[in-house]
Amino acid sequence: MSDFKKLNVWQEAHELTLSLYPATSTFPQSELYGLTAQMRRCCVSIGSNIAEGYGRARENEKARFLQITLGSLSELEYQVLVARDLGYLFSKDHEDLTNRILEIGRMLGSLVNKVRAASA
């Protein structure tokens, strides 16, 4: 089994998760089981899918899980936007989270291409 924790993209995803939790802790109580929980689950799934993909034996399986991760990343990007527009996120938190999401997206895109090339 590959050590996913050595991947820079997983490390960035993990840091994103750690920064998202305090950013969402100030959301209204009414969102605890709504947007707060949804954003947290989505963010955790990003690192989880990278880890699961790297636990797979075949490169095409890794690529599939990385594609799923890209979808979760887009979902989180939208949720961060909604949270900002509802006034739940401070401008600095929105900017920080969005920049991290975009960087992880670039890293994932490169990794998907690399994994696909290895499986061809």
Where are these regions (language model features)?
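Short, C-terminally biased terminal segments at protein or domain edges
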Residues: 1-120
